C-alpha cells in the first residue's frame, strides 16, 4: 500500500522521467497544442465560420449528466433512447405559445412549477415574441434559460377546427423527412470472427449497419428503423436482424396521440412503467429524482428489447385516458423444452446458439392509465397485465431468488404531483400481484430566491417485481430490493457561481447482484460551477461512494469464510471550457480516482484530455480529442462521454494505461445532405490482449470507424 505522497511522486516520475517514447511524445503534443491554442486562437479571425453550436453542446451536456459515472458492468441500462429523445426534441422544438404543461415537462431543466409559470405568464400577460422572453417568467434565470433554449421555439400554427383535419396542410404542418444510413466497424480482427460457427464463432461480418427513414409533422409521425449488430448475418438488403416501425397521430385536439407499431411507455415516477432511458444520480442534483413522465410515445431506438409493439392511445385534456396493447417476441435462454430464463435485453443474435433461441418467447402486455389534472398538480393511476407464452424460471443464485417466475404478472400504481407555494410534492406507490411493492415520496423546496432543495425517500421491497419499471435509486434498471434517503441542494452564490451537492444513504434488504447477504452504503457529490461569461465555463466536482461488499477471508483454523467490508471510491474532476470564437471551442478535463477494496487494497487512476471543436468552414465541423489515462486496475477505471455520429451514444470506460484519440467530422454538403465520419483508436502500453471471449483482440490497439449519411427535407 502506498501513501498519497508516494502516489503523487510516482505519478510525476511517470509523466516526466519514465514515460515510453510514445507517451512522452503524446504528452508533449498535448501540452504544445493546449498552450498554443490558448495563446493564438483568441487572435484568429475565421471569416467563413461564425456558427456557435450551442444546441449540440447543450444536448451533449444533458446526456453527460445522465452518464455521470455510469458503469455498464453493474447493470444493463438503456440510454440510447434518451439520447434520441433529446436529439428529436432539439430538432423539433416545442412552440411555447401553444404547448401545455405536459409537453413542457419533457424539457430537461423544467419541473412542474416552471412549466405552470410559463403557461400562466402566456395566458395572463402576453404571448411570447421570442424564447428569450422566458427570462421574465418567475423562477427562470439565465442558467435555466440557457439550458432549455435549444428545445423551445416561438411560432404560429393553424388554429384547430372540425374541418381542419380534412385539410392536407394540417397534416403537413412543419413537416420533415429524415433518412440516414450508418456503417460502423472495429478494424482489428476479434476472436469471434476467427472461430468456426460450430465452435461458437460469429456467424456474420463485423460490420454494424443501421438505417432509418422517418417523416414527422406537428400531427403525424411515420418511421422505419432497421439494424444489424456486429457478428449478425445480413444475407440480403431486407434481411436485417431487427426492424422497428410505427404510424402515429399526435397533438390532434383531445386525441393526444394514437400509435400503431412500436412505442414506449413512461408513467408517474417510473416505479411500475418506464421504458427507455432516464437520468440517474449525477450533477443535476435537484431535478433527477423527480421524473417528468413522457406518457406513450413512438419508439425509434435500435434498442431491440426495450419498447412495446402493438397499439397505444391517449385521449383527453384535464382528464386523460391512456390504453395500450403489445404482442411481441422476445429472446430468452432455454432451460429445457418448457422453461426459459427471463428475456434478455442485449438483442444480439451472432452465434449459432444465440440464433437458435432468437425470438423464442412470446410476450403479451396490456395496460392503461387515468390521469386527472387539477390547478396545482395531478393524480394518476396506472396498471398492466403481462403474460409469457412459456413459463419463466428464475436463477438459483442468492440474488436471483426474488426474480420473476411463472407466466403472468400484473401491477398497479398511483402517483401524484402537487404544488403548494414554494413546495412541490411528488411520489408513487406501486404493487405487483406476487405481493411485492414499492414506494417513492419526495419534496422539492424553494429556500429563498437562490436556493433549491429536494428530499426523497424510497423503499422497493425485495419481492417487488417491476419488470417494466425504472425508478430512481442506487441500482440502475428495474427497481427492487432497495431503501434509500436522498437529499440534494443547489445554491446560486451569484449569477456566475453555482454550488450543488447531494447525499444518498441506501441499503439493500436482501442479497443484491454478486452479494449473498444484505448490504448498505452511501454516496455524496459536491459540484461548483463558475461561468464568468458565455464563452468561458469551469467546474470542479468531487464524488465519494461507499458500499458494503463481500470478500473471502481465512480464519485462525485456515478455513475460508465470507465477510463484509467497505468498497470505497473517490472521484475528483476539473473541467474548463472556452469558446475562443464562434468557430473554435476548447475543452480540457482532468479526472482522478481513488478506489479501496474491502480487503483494504488501494488503487489510483487518472484521465486527462484535450478536446477541440472547430469550424474550418461554415458547413464543416470537426471534433477531436486526445486522452491519456493510467489506472492501477479495473477498480480505478475512468469514464468519458464522447462525440459521435448522430444518434450514437458513446461513453468510453478506460482502465490500465494508454491513450485514446478520436476525430469526428460533420460536413453539410447541401441543405438536404449531411455526412459524418468518426475514426477512433485506443492504444494500451501495458497490454497485449484486449477484451476476452469472442471480442478478444490480440494486440495493444483497438480502432473503430463509423460513417453516416443523412438526407432531410
Question: At which residue positions do the language-model features occur?
Answer:
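Bacterial N-terminal signal peptides
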Residues: 30-42
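Outer-membrane beta-barrel proteins
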Residues: 227-242, 298-304, 356-359, 430-432, ...
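N-terminal secretory signal peptides that target proteins for export/translocation
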Residues: 1-28
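Alpha-helical interaction/regulatory segments in DNA maintenance proteins
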Residues: 73-87, 124-127, 135-172, 267, ...
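Outer membrane beta-barrel
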Residues: 231, 236-331, 445-447, 451-466, ...
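Exposed, low-structure sequence patches enriched in small/polar residues
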Residues: 202-206, 363-375, 379-394, 403-713
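Transmembrane beta-strand segments of Gram-negative outer membrane beta-barrel proteins
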Residues: 166-197, 215-224, 258, 286, ...
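Small-residue hinge/turn detector
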Residues: 111-114, 141-142
Amino acid at each position: 500500500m502506498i501513501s498519497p505522497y508516494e502516489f503523487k511522486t510516482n505519478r510525476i516520475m511517470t509523466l516526466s522521467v519514465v514515460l515510453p517514447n510514445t507517451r512522452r511524445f503524446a504528452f508533449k503534443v498535448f501540452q504544445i497544442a493546449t498552450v498554443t491554442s490558448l495563446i493564438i486562437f483568441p487572435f484568429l479571425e475565421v471569416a467563413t465560420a461564425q456558427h456557435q453550436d450551442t444546441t449540440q453542446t447543450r444536448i451533449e451536456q444533458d446526456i453527460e449528466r445522465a452518464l455521470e459515472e455510469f458503469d455498464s458492468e453493474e447493470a444493463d441500462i438503456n440510454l440510447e433512447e434518451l439520447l434520441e429523445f433529446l436529439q428529436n426534441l432539439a430538432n423539433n422544438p416545442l412552440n411555447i405559445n401553444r404547448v401545455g404543461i405536459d409537453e413542457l415537462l419533457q424539457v430537461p431543466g423544467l419541473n412542474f412549477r416552471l412549466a405552470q409559470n410559463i403557461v400562466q405568464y402566456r395566458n395572463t400577460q402576453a404571448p411570447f415574441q421570442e424564447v428569450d422572453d422566458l427570462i421574465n417568467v418567475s423562477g427562470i434565470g439565465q442558467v435555466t434559460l440557457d439550458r432549455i433554449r435549444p428545445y423551445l421555439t416561438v411560432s404560429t400554427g393553424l388554429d384547430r377546427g372540425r374541418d381542419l383535419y380534412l385539410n392536407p396542410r394540417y397534416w403537413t404542418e412543419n413537416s420533415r423527412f429524415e433518412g440516414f444510413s450508418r456503417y460502423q466497424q472495429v478494424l482489428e480482427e476479434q476472436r469471434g470472427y476467427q472461430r468456426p460457427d460450430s465452435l461458437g464463432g460469429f456467424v456474420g461480418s463485423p460490420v454494424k449497419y443501421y438505417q432509418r427513414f422517418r417523416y414527422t409533422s406537428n400531427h403525424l409521425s411515420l418511421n422505419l428503423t432497421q439494424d444489424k449488430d456486429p457478428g449478425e448475418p445480413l444475407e440480403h438488403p431486407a434481411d436485417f436482424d431487427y426492424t422497428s416501425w410505427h404510424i402515429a397521430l399526435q397533438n390532434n385536439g383531445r386525441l393526444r396521440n394514437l400509435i400503431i407499431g412500436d412505442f414506449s411507455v413512461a408513467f408517474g415516477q417510473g416505479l411500475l412503467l418506464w421504458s427507455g432511458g432516464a437520468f440517474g444520480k449525477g450533477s443535476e442534483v435537484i431535478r433527477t429524482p423527480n421524473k417528468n413522465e413522457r406518457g406513450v410515445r413512438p419508439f425509434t431506438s435500435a434498442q431491440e428489447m426495450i419498447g412495446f409493439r402493438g397499439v397505444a392511445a391517449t385521449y383527453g385534456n384535464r382528464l386523460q385516458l391512456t390504453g395500450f396493447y403489445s404482442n411481441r417476441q422476445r429472446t430468452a435462454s432455454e432451460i429445457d423444452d418448457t422453461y426459459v430464463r427471463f428475456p434478455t435485453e442485449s438483442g444480439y443474435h451472432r452465434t449459432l446458439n444465440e440464433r437458435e433461441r432468437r425470438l423464442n418467447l412470446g410476450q403479451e402486455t396490456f395496460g392503461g392509465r387515468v390521469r386527472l389534472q387539477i390547478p396545482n398538480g395531478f393524480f394518476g393511476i396506472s396498471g398492466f397485465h403481462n403474460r409469457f407464452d412459456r413459463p419463466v424460471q428464475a436463477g438459483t443464485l442468492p440474488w436471483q431468488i426474488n426474480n420473476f417466475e411463472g407466466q403472468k404478472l400484473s401491477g398497479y400504481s398511483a402517483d401524484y404531483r402537487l404544488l403548494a407555494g414554494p413546495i412541490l410534492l411528488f411520489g408513487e406507490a406501486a404493487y405487483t400481484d406476487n405481493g411485492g411493492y414499492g414506494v417513492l415520496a419526495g419534496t422539492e423546496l424553494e429556500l429563498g430566491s437562490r436556493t433549491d432543495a429536494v428530499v426523497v425517500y424510497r423503499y422497493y421491497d425485495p419481492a417487488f417485481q417491476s419488470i417494466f419499471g425504472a425508478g430512481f435509486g442506487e441500482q440502475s434498471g428495474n427497481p427492487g430490493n432497495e431503501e434509500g434517503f436522498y437529499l440534494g441542494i443547489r445554491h446560486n452564490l451569484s449569477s456566475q457561481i453555482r454550488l450543488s451537492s447531494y447525499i444518498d444513504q441506501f441499503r439493500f434488504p436482501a442479497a443484491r447482484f454478486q452479494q449473498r447477504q444484505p448490504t448498505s452504503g452511501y454516496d455524496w457529490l459536491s459540484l461548483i460551477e463558475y461561468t464568468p461569461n458565455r464563452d468561458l465555463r469551469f467546474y470542479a466536482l468531487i464524488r465519494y461512494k461507499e458500499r458494503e461488499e463481500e470478500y473471502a477471508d481465512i480464519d485462525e483454523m485456515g478455513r475460508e469464510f465470507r465477510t463484509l467490508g467497505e468498497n470505497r471510491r473517490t472521484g475528483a474532476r476539473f473541467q474548463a471550457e472556452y469558446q475562443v470564437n464562434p468557430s473554435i471551442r476548447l475543452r480540457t478535463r482532468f479526472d482522478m480516482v481513488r478506489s479501496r477494496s474491502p480487503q483494504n487494497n488501494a488503487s489510483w487512476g487518472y484521465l486527462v484530455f484535450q478536446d477541440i471543436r472547430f469550424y474550418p468552414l461554415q458547413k464543416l465541423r470537426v471534433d477531436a480529442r486526445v486522452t491519456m489515462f493510467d489506472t492501477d486496475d479495473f477498480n480505478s477505471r475512468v469514464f468519458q462521454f464522447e462525440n459521435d455520429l448522430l444518434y450514437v451514444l458513446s461513453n468510453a470506460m478506460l482502465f490500465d494505461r494508454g491513450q485514446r484519440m478520436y476525430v469526428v467530422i460533420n460536413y453539410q454538403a447541401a441543405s438536404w445532405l449531411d455526412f459524418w465520419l468518426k475514426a477512433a483508436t485506443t492504444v494500451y502500453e501495458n497490454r497485449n490482449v484486449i477484451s476476452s471471449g469472442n471480442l478478444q483482440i490480440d494486440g495493444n490497439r483497438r480502432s473503430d470507424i463509423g460513417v453516416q449519411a443523412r438526407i432531410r427535407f
